[in-house]
Amino acid sequence: MTEGSKVSEIMKNLSMQVNLDDFIPATEEEKEYMVQMRPSTTAFKDGIRRLRKNKVAMVSFYIILIITLSAIFVPMFWPYKYEMMLGMQPGKPVDATFNNLRPFEYSASELALKEQGQKVFPHIFGTDSAGRDYFIRVVYGTRISLAVGFFASIIVLVIGLLVGSVSGYAGGKVDMFIMRIVDIIYSLPDMLMVILLASVLKMTLASKLDGTPLAKIGSNIISLFIIFALLYWVSMARLVRGQILSLREQEYVLAAQAAGAKGGWVIRKHLLPNCVSVIVISTALQIPSAIFTESYLSFLGLGVNAPMPSLGSLASDALNGLSSYPYRLVIPAIVISLIVLSLNLFGDGLRDAFDPKLNS
């Protein structure tokens, strides 16, 4: 082989061009596999994917969904109303046999109707001492407890976002002043302050709400919302402040400030959107706390106004006949425990799925 042919052979081997004859043709199965492209994903989609893999969180979510839908829709078609005293019908004598019926037990008049061949809707959980269907009272009490927990958490969210974002972004004396207020509220005994405020507000609001649209809601529920607005925003404010402090030195925030953007615009457009996952998780964990607070206040007689039921007031009323009708206490206690446990487990699942610190 001549020297020139050797050089050309070496140059051919060093060439960047690919010789297709050196490769085995791909099979049809390999070609189909190669054209399959992975769909694009986002942080939200990635978090949802991780959440769906968490079986405990998903079971908790479906339990919450079933309880919520039942609390909303069951009273719409149930033949009994939560305040209806079945033994006191207009134009008829009082029928005391409706009082204290056990589960699936019928009164004397209902048994007479059944003997005549008429259909009578059963009392699944029996009736209470006033002859009211206990099942619909538990369902309606669940609706009230869930509604109070949800709206109280929204109040905490709004106040905590406002105070925490201002404190974290402003810094300096403003931050120090707000944090000292937070420290003072944290130092107060929670239970004592809640009971004290509930007692004072109950007496104060009862007379002022008469004749107003808020009277239908009840002074006790309004006082609950005021208590949450006064005492329970501090954790959310601290959380948001910490997130704002860690984000306000980022380059995109400094660029917006250099461009002349105002503080409110920077907070709305840049800072809070980057705190959404943490805020959602904290709000989800706040709901069971609000439900538990409402339940024990109702248990103490400081919750919803009668005859409107809540799970706590049902448990409190059940104490009078505990030895004879223990299921009246067990049923609302189980519902409260199931709601609070499911919400806490679902909140933990959200945190595991969306908290970037846990995923790093």
Go through the PLM ranges and name each one:
Residues 130-360:
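Alpha-helical transmembrane segments of integral membrane proteins
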Residues 1-157, 161, 165, 307, ...:
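Gly/Trp-centered helix-boundary motif
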